[in-house]
Amino acid sequence: MQESRQQKSGGGFELLFDEDRLKIYYNKIFPFSLMFKWISYNKLNAGQKALTSLDEGISSNYFHFREFSFTLANDVYCRYLCFKTAEQFKETLVDRVPYKIDIGAVYNIPPDRHNASDKRAFIPVQKEMVFDIDMNDYDDVRTCCTGANVCEKCWEFLKIAMIVLTDILVEDFDFENVLWVFSGRRGIHAWICDESAREMNNEMRSAVVSYCNLGVGNENSGRTTLSYPLHPRLQSIYKKLLPEFKRIIIDEHNLLSVEKHRKKFLDYCPDLTTKNKVDAIW
């Protein structure tokens, strides 16, 4: 049986998967009851009680009408999967052993019947709003790792991202249910689970994303010069992050001491006097 992880030459570990271990994980560890409770949002069928064990056969059309997709071994991709109960969900995962599970929208009919109806009649009715933050987005400012590699120092950036985005979503948009989860490889996902978010159309979602996006990207994307005075939300973020800047950027990553990182970092600075002063000091 293949080892589940191996140590890399540069430190840290690279995760390796094998079907035997995944089958044990799905059979013994995977939180099926919690997943069912979360994704059904207590929208159970008439006469049903809250789920307490998998063998109760508790059903929910809200769960049943939700699309799942699996990525199996050798990158075999399966769409339009759905399940009536948590027990059926478990049986399928243990049997098919997916390497990746994607949770899709809730449709107006069970997704496995999408070919039995007019495509215009198969429509999504609800879906959580999800923000995806990848670790490689921080390659300009982290000195420890690159790409999909992640260490404890890297996670400091993701922790800050969670704090900032949660503040915006809760304080500016009045969302209450923000679930942060590890994406499974190189980043984190924020699932906004409020019903108001699940009912948003694409235009509404784009407006929220646009509000949260400064447009200050990595070296391969466009950069935005901020105008002053700063927007009140940016002022609040600045005050909150200033102490973390010294701890993470200066002390932990020692970013300004390495010329190539310092140059890349100073490219973000709009004030020439400040850039020259920092460059001279370091």
Residue map of PLM features:
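A short beta-strand motif that forms the metal-chelation/ATP-contact edge
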Residues: I188-E195
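Signature for HUH/AEP ssDNA processing cores
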Residues: Q2-S183, E195-N202, A207-V209, L214-W282
